[in-house]
Amino acid sequence: RLLNTADAQGAAQALALDAALTWTAVQVQAAPAVEVNGALDVRTLQASVVAAQMAGALSSVFQRSLQYANERQQFGRPIGKFQAIQHQLAVMSEHVFAARMAAQLGCSAGHDGMGVVPDRLRVATAKARCSEAALVVSELAHAIHGAIGFTEEYDLQLFTRRLHAWRQTAGSEAYWYGVAGEALLHHQGMTLDIVRRITDVDTVL
């Protein structure tokens, strides 16, 4: 069932970043049901959702870093005017948009008339790429922000800490690259066919 997080009751957790969410039995029964293929791998479904979350967080981290670089003054001008910072932002941009495209492919895995059925290979690509980007983007974001990015009062750490947690959720990039590699080893045709299977979709969300 599709449960609205806005309707949930939240409770703080001692060892987790996010609150524990609970719904009443009435809310659960009233929530719309989505029919899912019985053979669906739950980890694959979870990974597709987490990849989308990561893509959004990566974009937010990049936008915050870009804004900070344009506002922070050093030596009489914004630090974003320095070539070293521009290079870091360019690298971040590459990873952020690559992760976004991969997550879109993972979420557009298809519908067979029986419910949501993610394509495992597309999801593997999405989760692996987003997890890989999380390391690079988080590191560069904190490098650009300096010490302020590590403080509890500054919002950057709310995103980067979750990116590191989500990187391991439903399998890290090492796990999903292994899934993709296994699919490639068992494929009997051309490698290009695998690439087409991942990237050729009718509509990218």
Which ranges hold each PLM region?
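FAD-binding core of flavoproteins
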Residues: 1-63, 67, 191-205
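Alpha-helical interface subdomain recognition
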Residues: 48-205
